[in-house]
Amino acid sequence: MNPQKLMNQLKQAQERMQQEIATLQIEAASGGGMVKVVMDGQKNLKSLRIDPEVVSKEEVEMLQDLVTAAVNEAARKVDEEIQEKIGGLAGGMKIPGLL
């Protein structure tokens, strides 16, 4: 196989993968669903939903912990999804500069 053709195919695959990752919408929750977040493939927080039951002066610290946990879980899920997509594309190989 022509090395130049292979490089072009890899570049096209990389571009497709980056487009797929950009459209990811990952949801995660904490506190039994009391706090839910949606994060995109670049780990930007897109939405945050908080059950009104956890919003009170006495529960602020718990709410902060739940939000932190939900955001961290969403980031972990984004990483996991990206690794699955890359693994399928590259057959498990680590390709420098793919993301």
Q: Where do the PLM segments sit?
A:
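Long amphipathic alpha-helical segments used for membrane anchoring, targeting, substrate engagement
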Residues: 1-29, 77-99
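Conserved acidic
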Residues: 2, 59-66
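Residue-level signature of catalytic and energy-coupling elements of molecular machines
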Residues: 10, 43, 67
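Short, small/polar residue-rich loop motifs at catalytic or cofactor-binding pockets
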Residues: 21, 31-33, 57
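N-terminal intrinsically disordered, cationic/polar leader segments
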Residues: 25-49
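A short interface-forming secondary-structure element
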Residues: 48-60
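Short, charged/polar low-complexity linear motifs in solvent-exposed/disordered segments
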Residues: 54, 64-65, 80-81
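Stable alpha-helical structural segments in soluble proteins, enriched in small hydrophobic residues
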Residues: 66, 70-78
